[in-house]
Amino acid sequence: MKTNKLKQQKGTLLRVLQYVKPYRVLVIVSLLCACVSAAAQLLIPILTGKAIDQMLGAGQVNLSGVLVFAVWIAVVAALSAIAQQFLATSNNKIAYNISRDLRNAAFHKLQRLPLSYLDAHPSGDLVSRMIADVDTFSDGLLMGFTQLFTGVVLIVGTLTIMLIKNWMIALLVVVLTPLSMFVASFIARKTHHYFTEQARVRGQQTALINELIEGQKVVQSFGHEAASLSDFNCINDELGRVSLNATFFSSLTNPSTRLVNNIIYAAVALVGALSAVGGGISVGDLSVFLSYASQYAKPFNEISGVVTELQNALACAARVFSLLDEDDRVPDKENAVVLSPKGTVDLKDVCFRYVPDRPLIEGFNLHVKPGQRIAIVGPTGCGKTTMINLLMRFYDVNSGAILVDGTDIRDATRHSLRKSFGMVLQDTWLKAGTIRDNIAYGRPDASEEDVIAAAKAAHAHSFIRRLPDGYDTVITENGGNISQGQKQLLCIARVMLGGENGELPPMLILDEATSSIDTRTEIKIQSAFARLMNGRTSFIVAHRLSTIQEADVILVMKDGHIIEQGTHEELLKKQGFYANLYQSQFALS
């Protein structure tokens, strides 16, 4: 188990280094700055010792010599400060560039992931990986570059000078140093596990908060505040527990290594004092050794803290890399066809299931002629919306085939397939921006006149005009400052504006497109839809059967099969499932 964890950490570290590679020039600059800063820090104790040796006792002070060394100490200290400033700037660029690259890679990965992955993972957890985990990784990386470079150079330089000055005292330091490294290594192994858990639970908490914010109206309407608070408290307590464990073990690092380093310092002071009394070294050299013993210990304290932070950073990086390692959706074939369809659609023996042992659609066959209006009705969970997902190739069929103008959609480019459909869904989605931006989402270069014409066709112009800023009204996240019905009207206007070059797509998908609109507006919209659907192959998913009476063919689905099909009048005459469904709706109304 430990071996696997070490392999995972090593693998994560190697992948991090791949992200560092493009910035190797900055890394070299950081190393040079670290060397200059460390050399300056190493030189100051020597200059201080020389200055002390200019003061032999009362009345035996070489003031001019002391002043010379004092000036040199000031110059070297200034040089060290300048080098540290350049080091910090260079390290900031490295850390922020790497975090930007990692976040870019994660976002581009999201664009390539299959819809099945996004459906199966809470959006809050994905947001946590891309924001919180990358930020934590960046902070740990910045601390690592800033303190690790200087610390390593200081340790090597200090040890070298101590060996030159007095190898016996230096040997004492070398013998005791592994104690500090052992303590830091032991604590680092403990903290990695807890930091990994902390990142995982933080992702779950973000997902829960995101879910509760989006569904707050439902939560309050059902009086579910107490239960929601209980769920949050449960996961918050778990996050507190793992965070406390991570903090506890990481906080042990500094005092533990400091204790060991204080022992080293005391041993050097004792042995050095005995050597000075015996005339083995001067008082100035003893002060140099004591400074170096302290300086030698300090990087170990800092590096032990860096190791702890790097454990946290690697744990967060591993979560981001696990996202990057997910399989992409099936790519377009190399010789994929660019569709320019007229509107013929064939479903041949289509079978599909979300879960391997739970069939949803089985042996589905359908032939749709260009310009036909196909309505799909049936009870919840019968596969209506799944059919739309398959037509748009958000999911691929498990067996069988879907053909558009005789071409298997798996042999066509996704872009050309989806461009061939205009789609209005029940779940409205608007991007942050102005109303104009949202209507022109599929056609950014549309003129003001075209945008207004589309809004009028969708009967959205009147409510837009009443808004304080009209078409320049900024919509908050997912349209939170307008009603659900108004959002749906904007989505309809978006389709009515058309795609590239202002051309309307040859096929339409309307999935409960008027479910949130009042009856009077719906009647007006239906007439606009009738004009829009004229000559275009249209698939209409509906729960309200009053909206699909003019369809050329109504497909009645149940348990993934077509159990009835025909026009509205034909199905009513059959007195079957559709007739019962229709009569029950109107009886309820």
Predicted regions and their residues:
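Membrane-integrated ABC transporters
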Residues: 1-41, 56-69, 87-91, 95, ...
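Hydrophobic alpha-helical segments in the permease module
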Residues: 72-80, 84, 177-184, 250-264, ...
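Cytosolic ends of transmembrane helices, especially the final helix of ABC transmembrane type-1 domains
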Residues: 224, 248, 265, 295-323
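Juxtamembrane loop-to-helix connectors within ABC transporter transmembrane domains
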Residues: 12, 20, 52, 87, ...
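ABC-type nucleotide-binding domain
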Residues: 332, 338-589
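Transmembrane helices of ABC transporter permease
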Residues: 22, 26-39, 72, 76-79, ...
